[in-house]
């Protein structure tokens, strides 16, 4: 895969620079893509993800939470705990903690050091994809779109697309052809029964659960979208449309 460590470091820098100039009111802005979280809470979460990935405490059931309500509840409690334990800390302290963790995590993402024993095979890609998603969640909450050309955004699309293919196989669904700009590929096994075309950023947001069902249905489908709608994202789709 492409430079996971470089993409993560770049996205970490981008989010850090975005947050650096925010006052307390802006940090308390609700994030529509992450109900019950504020901008500050998202920073606490991505810092917690770095801590768990580097420390060997990443929730291993996350990959299967899409198909198991108990795992989904456990995943939600895991991420809530990351936020809860850091909620009262100043942003400067969170950024400093994140930077310290990155000194361990980024060499691991680069493959220079092994992940902690017992880590899931997908651990190297997950923090990058998660950070890419939340970078745009925060931008959307603040009304400051941007970073669509960030390396993590492009990698996030590919990672979430690969996870979609795994869900399609596990769910016994037909393969799906994806078109993102001038890129085209198939996820799943066998001949695709439909295709989905979108701008790369829009496809990334759809596959990462940041588009409502109506928004997903309105995308450029060729073929019946129904067999794919409940598996397109690994999380419940938002009830209302999201703009970013």
Model-derived segments and spans:
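An N-terminal domain-cap segment
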Residues: 1-44, 55
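Short, helix-capping/interhelical loops that line the mouth of catalytic, cofactor-
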Residues: 1-3, 51-111
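Structured surface interface patches that mediate subunit assembly and partner/cofactor docking
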Residues: 1-6, 29-30, 35, 58-69, ...
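Hydrophobic faces of stable alpha-helices that mediate helix-helix packing
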Residues: 9-12, 98-106, 128-131
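Short amphipathic alpha-helical segments enriched in hydrophobics
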Residues: 12, 19-26, 46, 50-57, ...
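Alpha-helical scaffold segments in carbohydrate-active enzymes
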Residues: 14, 41-52, 104, 130-137
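Acidic-glycine-rich active-site phosphate/pyrophosphate-binding loop
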Residues: 17-20, 106-112, 177
């Amino acid at each position: 895969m492409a430079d996971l460590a470089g993409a993560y470091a770049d996205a970490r820098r981008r989010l850090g620079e975005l947050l650096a100039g925010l006052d307390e009111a802006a940090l308390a802005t609700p994030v529509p893509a992450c109900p019950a979280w504020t901008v500050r809470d998202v920073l606490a979460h991505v810092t917690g993800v770095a801590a768990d990935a580097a420390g060997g405490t990443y929730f291993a059931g996350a990959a299967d939470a899409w198909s198991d309500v108990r795992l989904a509840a456990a995943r939600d409690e895991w991420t809530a705990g990351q936020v809860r334990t850091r909620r009262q800390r100043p942003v400067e302290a969170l950024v400093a903690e994140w930077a310290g963790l990155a000194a361990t995590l980024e060499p691991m993402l680069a493959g220079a050091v092994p992940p902690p024993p017992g880590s899931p095979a997908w651990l190297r890609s997950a923090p990058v994809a998660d950070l890419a998603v939340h970078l745009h969640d925060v931008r959307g909450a603040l009304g400051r779109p941007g970073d669509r050309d960030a390396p993590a955004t492009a990698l996030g699309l590919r990672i979430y697309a690969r996870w979609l293919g795994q869900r399609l196989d596990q769910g016994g669904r037909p393969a799906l052809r994806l078109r993102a700009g001038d890129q085209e590929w198939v996820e799943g096994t066998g001949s695709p029964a439909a295709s989905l075309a979108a701008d790369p950023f829009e496809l990334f947001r759809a596959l990462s659960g940041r588009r409502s069902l109506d928004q997903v249905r309105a995308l450029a489908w060729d073929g019946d979208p129904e067999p794919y709608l409940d598996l397109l994202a690994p999380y419940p789709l938002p009830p209302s449309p999201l703009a970013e």
